[in-house]
Amino acid sequence: YLPSMSDRLLLALLLTCGGTGVLLAQPSENFDHGQAIYREHCMECHGTTGKGDGVKAPFLSPRPGNLISAATSAKTDQELLRTIAQGKPRTAMPAWQNVLPAEDQQAVLQYIRSLVRFARPLAPPPPGP
């Protein structure tokens, strides 16, 4: 069996994403919770689609990170959770470790990962059959 070009591209994409299963993972039960946290705490800077184009973005220097970029997608969950918890020095990204409990940080991370997978703004997954 010789893998097709689309099979090879899918494998390359999965490997680029660090093998995290981001593209194949099903929406978790934390989706709604993570989405609510994102709307409340993240959307103003990172925007509805995670591109870093929220309503506050034009006023921030440096601009907010693009959460759906290849560079962000390649980061491990641990790296992203560290950024959520500790913030980013010399940016407007605050530390959330004393604001959000660990399970909320994990839920928002799962929601951010879903933005890459679905590539659509703040829409819940379609209802099952």
Label every PLM stretch briefly.
Residues 53-54, 93-96, 121:
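Short, hydrophobic secondary-structure boundary micro-motifs
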Residues 59-115:
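Extracytoplasmic electron-transfer domains, predominantly the class I c-type cytochrome c fold
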